[in-house]
Amino acid sequence: MGARGNHTVDTSKQLAALRELMKKENVDVWVVPSEDQHYSEYLAHCDERRAFISGFNGSAGCAVITLDKAYLFTDGRYFLQAEKQLDSNWTLMKQGLPDVPTWQDFLHKTLDGSLKIGIDATIITEEDAAGLRKNLAPKKSELVPSKKNLVDIVWGSERPARPQNPVFHLDEKYSGQSFKEKVKKVREEIAKEKGKAFVVTMLDEVAWLFNLRGSDIDYNPVFFAYAVVTPDEVVLFINEKQLDDAARDYLGQDVKIRGYDELYDYLKELPKSLSLTGDKDGEKILVTSRTSLAITETITPPSSPESTTFHKVVRSPVGDLKAIKNAVEIEGFRQCHIRDGAALARYFAWLEEALNEGKEVSEYAGAEVLEKYRSELDLFRGLSFTTISSTGPNGAIIHYSPDPQDCAIIKKDQVYLCDSGAQFSDGTTDVTRTWHFGTPRPEEVRAFTRVLQGHIAIDTAVFPNGTTGYLIDSWARRSLWQDGLDYRHGTGHGVGHFLNVHEGPQGIGVRIAYNNTALKAGMTVSNEPGYYEDGQYGIRIENIVIVKEVKLPNNFGDKGYLGFEHVTMCPIQTKLIDASLLTEPEKKWVNDYHQEVWQKVSPLLQNDKRALEWLKRETTPI
């Protein structure tokens, strides 16, 4: 999501120091991806290497540094932010635009040949490394995986320490399933793949598997750990001091605890202890495509005979199981979104009144008030990402978030976009609403209405089992395309249950990965089409929806059919809707949705007359 601060950072000193190290290590290029050793999207501060070396702190991007140049690759969500943050040392590579290569293609297509390209082996996957090696070979360039991270050395004593915050047990009245039941299902999936073990590397998967939560990464209730599941044992690799007494008691004798740094020693011996032969058709240690090269080369050392491999890359059984919420989790999603809706109503009512009274409210101050209202809700555990509170042109910066020292004042005559969310013991929320507190311009109303039509198209979609989010993404864009408009981000991402607000493998968008995962009943995804006019405004309407089974008059092919249940409960501003563009079913959808919001949220606002009156007005039928 957003990242605080949009100032340019002078990176001359750190680049000079890095280049000196590169010369000592005999590498011509150093690659700095966004990810940490767990392939996390959002990072602990100690792992924000790309932000440290480049000054760009968006959540997606890759830095490529040569001995005389530096390049930052990122996607359309972050073009404007990167332009603001990068200094003159850097060239911004706008991935997705014509003739702009990916960073991987850049290394072998654009750079000279006969180069040594260095990267930390713990933050590149085996698959990516193999692809790079294959493409670099014709140019006689070489990938040099390193056991040390040169950026960490440059960062030195100023690098933040790795967090070791308390880890606690999430009660089964919220999780809906014991960790023993989850492990049993994982073992069944391991057996189907002729596996003898599965290495769990993703932090949200470790947390979900053991019904544990932490706070080692801001906004993400996870903790630094790995796990290995075999037919006979379950091992959790964690700093044991982080486990509180209740968590330790919950795991009991069923889980062996080893130090976080002991994983590699354990994996080195695992093929032997499992009596694996390494034969092509033999049993394997299962890993996912997001497992680091350092881990896979520990399991199957590069020195092994060519025909010998002790590991196999598979879809994560934990990720697939986690994506489908159980009945308890689904009910938690419904309830936490109703409570969240009350906080949103209180905030938007307060903000409107403040602006009408001529008070100055900065983007950051607004976000602080919204957090205050949320913090008063039952089961609140914190925000789920940095609030994107953006007025006018800042709304066009898709993942903008306000700098407390230097942000805009929210203006009545500008579009205001607010994308925010919270963590609760019973679920995770993520909601975007777009408002105008004055008189919107006709082009703003038309664009908003087109975005709304795309939102309704996804919300009301019906599709057969086996359909992917890749396939239905265009339904959200069709109405925008009719006006020659579009947006440079996905339509929806998976959402964790009191876990990461961005969850895979499910999603709605044009990423090829979304075509590999069919939408299934119980999955949770966002529905968030938008439109952004650079330098002027941004529009986005986002609800969280749950995939559900639907009963239809027919059932062609005996496939069974699916649809969506929206759980987000917050009005969509009717002032910004051109009702003449809507079909009758679309108008009915708006009115039905607003009636539902009123019925579910108004009982929670009986002690806030201002918010109650605001909600009544904003849910009036069109």
UniProtKB/Swiss-Prot annotation:
The keyword Hydrolase appears for this protein: yes
Textual note on the cofactor: Binds 2 manganese ions per subunit.
Enzyme class name: hydrolase
Residues that coordinate or bind Mn(2+) 2: 419, 430, 542
EC number annotated for this UniProt entry: 3.4.11.9
One CC-aspect GO term: cytoplasm
UniProt binding sites for Mn(2+) 1: 430, 528, 542
Molecular function (Gene Ontology), one example: metalloaminopeptidase activity
SUPFAM superfamilies to which the protein is assigned, alphabetical: Creatinase/aminopeptidase (SSF55920), Creatinase/prolidase N-terminal domain (SSF53092)
GO annotation terms (biological process): proteolysis
Catalytic activity, reaction form: Release of any N-terminal amino acid, including proline, that is linked to proline, even from a dipeptide or tripeptide
Keywords recorded for this protein, A-Z: Aminopeptidase, Hydrolase, Manganese, Metal-binding, Metalloprotease, Protease
InterPro entries assigned: Creatin/AminoP/Spt16_N (IPR029149), Creatinase/aminopeptidase-like (IPR036005), Creatinase_N (IPR000587), Pept_M24 (IPR000994), Pept_M24B (IPR033740), Peptidase_M24_C (IPR032416), X-Pro_aminopeptidase_P (IPR050422)
A Pfam match: Creatinase_N
Cofactor(s) the record lists: Mn(2+)
Coiled coil: none
Function: Catalyzes the removal of a penultimate prolyl residue from the N-termini of peptides.
Protein family: Belongs to the peptidase M24B family.
PANTHER family for the chain: XAA-PRO AMINOPEPTIDASE 1
Protein name, UniProt field: Probable Xaa-Pro aminopeptidase P
Annotated gene: AMPP
